[in-house]
Regions:
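Bacterial Sec-dependent N-terminal signal peptides
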Residues: 1-22
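Conserved, structured core segments of small domains
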Residues: 20-140
Length: 140
């Protein structure tokens, strides 16, 4: 019984070791230059925008959304915002997401609070740390 168990463990260990191979396309120097760790990954700030408590008339809402779009452009131009987009209507009232190329939740909160739609409570924002490929910031 011990021999059978040992043989099975040895066999599965061999398969596991064979499955662990380096990615020949992985560029460690590029990953490091983008702030990536040994795995080519880094922390980002993920923002989920939700419907807020403020429900203004259409003219005010349109003005706030215009400011929201201008803020998105400003953050993208600065390289701090790498993904932004709306979500399809859903039961959780999620309206959109941001992925920010910044290090801390505190900086994320400051940047999100610079958005007039968030400041006015037309949108609320939840912030999370998100671990993703350092190459995401190449898309900007």
């Amino acid at each position: 019984m011990k021999r059978t168990l040992f043989a099975a463990v040895l066999m599965f260990s061999s398969f596991y070791a064979l499955g662990q191979s380096d990615n020949p396309k992985f560029d460690q120097a590029l990953a490091k230059s983008l702030g990536g760790d040994d795995y080519g990954m880094k922390m980002y700030i993920l923002v989920i925008l939700k419907t807020g408590s403020f429900s203004p008339e259409k003219r005010i809402s349109d003005s706030l959304f215009m400011g929201h779009m201008q803020n998105i452009k400003r953050l993208a131009d600065s390289g701090k915002l790498i993904v932004a987009g709306p979500m399809k209507k859903n039961e959780r009232n999620y309206r959109g997401i941001f992925i920010m190329n910044i290090a801390t939740l505190e900086e994320g909160r400051v940047l999100v609070d610079s958005d007039p739609a968030v400041r006015s409570k037309l949108l609320d924002a939840e912030l999370f740390q998100w671990y993703g490929s350092a190459a995401h910031c190449l898309s900007t």
